[in-house]
Swiss-Prot record:
Ranges of Pro residues composition bias in the record: 130-144
GO CC, one annotated term: mitochondrion
Assembly information from the UniProt record: Associates with the ATP synthase complex. Interacts with MT-ATP6; interaction is direct. Interacts with ATP5MC2; interaction is direct.
Protein's name in the database: DnaJ homolog subfamily C member 30, mitochondrial
Organism from which the protein derives: Homo sapiens (Human)
């Protein structure tokens, strides 16, 4: 698992260009940023790769980065893209990018080109709760459950599916509520304008009728005197 994360970070970060130019590389399979820190003089260092992955500019606020992270996770979550290795890899890369950009300290170092493996192994980074299995040790098969008829169920049968409605409501509920209120105000304004237009039209009709009646009455009165 650690070696797989190392390969993902190599594809994720633009520092592979530095390796091709002969810069040293840390062989330790951590999060894969390399033990060497890159100064501002390294012209090949890209300070926008992680931002591009989340789809935000480098000037984005922490709230915008968090919203983009939730949006990307929603699009590429494995439960939503079952069987897609590309989506699973993209989901992992998005999570790793948010480890850096979601932290103000790590983001500042990344923007300056000073991010290293030591920073990612620091207390600000949450390690995985489940250790990677030893390749040499025998693997215990996952427990299987039995159905009511006594047959064995598949290991993934009891897997809880990802609740996209709850996810979207939890992270976008406030925005949805603002949009709902805005639509309600627009609808009320439209009805008010229609009512005023109809009221104005009725007044114009009444005014024209009254003017015609007044002119007709004047002609009748003049006719009597003539």
């Amino acid at each position: 698992m650690a070696a797989m994360r190392w390969r993902w970070w190599q594809r994720l970060l633009p520092w592979r260009l530095l390796q091709a130019r002969g810069f040293p590389q840390n062989s330790a399979p951590s999060l894969g940023l390399g033990a060497r820190t890159y100064s501002q003089g390294d012209c090949s260092y890209s300070r926008t790769a992680l931002y591009d992955l989340l789809g935000v500019p480098s000037t984005a606020t922490q709230a915008q980065i968090k919203a983009a992270y939730y949006r990307q996770c929603f699009l590429y979550h494995p439960d939503r893209n079952s069987g897609s290795a590309e989506a699973a890899e993209r989901f992992t890369r998005i999570s790793q990018a948010y480890v850096v950009l979601g932290s103000a300290t790590l983001r500042r170092k990344y923007d300056r080109g000073l991010l290293s493996d030591e920073d990612l192994r620091g207390p600000g980074v949450r390690p995985s709760r489940t250790p990677a299995p030893d390749p040499g040790s025998p693997r215990t098969p996952p427990p299987t459950s039995r159905t009511h008829d006594g047959s064995r169920a598949s290991p993934g049968a009891n897997r809880t599916m990802f609740n996209f409605d709850a996810f979207y409501q939890a992270h976008y509920g406030e925005q949805l509520e603002r949009e709902r209120r805005l639509r309600a105000r627009r609808e009320a304004l439209r009805k008010r304008q229609e009512y005023r237009s109809m009221k104005g039209l009725r007044w114009e009709d009444t005014r024209d009728t009254a003017a015609i009646f007044l002119i007709f009455s004047i002609f009748i009165i003049i006719g009597f005197y003539i």
